[in-house]
Amino acid sequence: MPKMKTKSSVKKRFKITATGKVMCGPGNKRHGLINRPQKMKRTNRGPQTMTDMDAKTIKQWAPYGLS
């Protein structure tokens, strides 16, 4: 049986921690920031943890994990 391939978009956008959580960068940071509240801009700075259902899908698309 051939090897399964990891989706290229998943490699670029997500990281899997040692405990198995999936981390992603938040959206809504490209333009229109002058209209957004300061709290939203502040919380969008760092990486965020994905929900369990979304993380399950991402892990299926990355069968060998992400380094």
UniProtKB/Swiss-Prot annotation:
One of its GO terms (molecular function) is structural constituent of ribosome. Keywords: Ribonucleoprotein, Ribosomal protein. Coiled coil: none annotated. Residues 28-44 have a biased composition (Basic residues). Residues 21-50 are annotated as: Disordered. One of its GO terms (cellular component) is ribosome. InterPro entries: Ribosomal_bL35 (IPR001706), Ribosomal_bL35-like (IPR021137), Ribosomal_bL35_CS (IPR018265), Ribosomal_bL35_sf (IPR037229). Pfam families: Ribosomal_L35p. GO terms for biological process: translation. Belongs to the bacterial ribosomal protein bL35 family. HAMAP family: Ribosomal_bL35. This is Large ribosomal subunit protein bL35. It comes from Gluconobacter oxydans (strain 621H) (Gluconobacter suboxydans). The gene is rpmI.
